[in-house]
């Protein structure tokens, strides 16, 4: 948005004051998306008065990962924050996930001297649910596991828990899914699953349906079909 002429520090304090007036124990839950929350709006707020949701941490983390497109040098400063997975955009239905990045990002944040001090947990921030349940299972196990693990290791246990059997065919199928369509690479910042070209405006050079989507495979389709 356009912040021209807005005293962001004063605006942030006004919001905080209004919340505290209604409830002295109020905590401002705020989303981290692109340039928001603006640094001047939050830098002078008291520690403990705010919880920042790192909305798209599995793809564009803002807690301080220097490889991120939305890198913040100082992360969320003194404020508490949650490591969140967005995963689903617009309620689109399709297989998609970033298993390795989700796992490594969480443990990288735990190992970071600054980010680890204020990380309070994990969260989900999807625009649609009832698909890709394996990703939510994975996310919510992260805080319970002290040591870093691989997606391949985790999927072995997931298969046994889900199907109550140690079937080799099931293991093979999930290992293929976990290494392909559920392991979108770091450089892919598409917003959720592939979109159908039939949803795009007709044209001779159409290859995606929306500005932030993809239709080009980052995996071998033979591993999914």
Name each region found by the language model.
Residues 1-178, 183-191, 198-224:
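Catalytic-core regions of glycoside hydrolase
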């Amino acid at each position: 948005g356009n912040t021209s002429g807005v005293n962001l520090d004063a605006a942030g304090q006004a919001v905080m004051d209004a919340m505290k007036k209604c409830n002295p124990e109020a905590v401002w839950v705020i989303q981290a998306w692109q340039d928001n929350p603006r640094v001047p709006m939050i830098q002078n707020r008291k520690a403990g008065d705010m919880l920042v949701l790192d909305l798209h941490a599995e793809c564009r983390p803002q807690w301080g990962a220097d490889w991120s497109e939305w890198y913040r040098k100082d992360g969320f400063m003194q404020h508490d924050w949650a490591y969140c997975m967005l995963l689903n955009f617009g309620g689109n239905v399709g297989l998609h996930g970033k298993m390795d990045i989700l796992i490594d990002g969480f443990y990288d944040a735990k190992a970071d001297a600054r980010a680890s001090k204020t990380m309070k947990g994990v969260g989900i921030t999807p625009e649609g649910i009832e698909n890709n349940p394996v990703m939510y299972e994975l996310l919510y196990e992260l805080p319970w596991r002290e040591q870093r693990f691989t997606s391949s290791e985790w999927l072995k246990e997931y298969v046994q828990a889900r199907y109550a059997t140690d079937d080799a065919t099931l293991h093979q199928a999930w290992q293929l899914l976990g290494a392909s369509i559920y392991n979108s690479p770091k450089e892919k910042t598409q917003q959720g699953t592939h979109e159908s070209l039939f949803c795009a405006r007709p044209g001779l050079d159409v290859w995606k349906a929306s500005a932030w989507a993809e239709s080009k495979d980052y995996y071998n389709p033979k591993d999914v079909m």
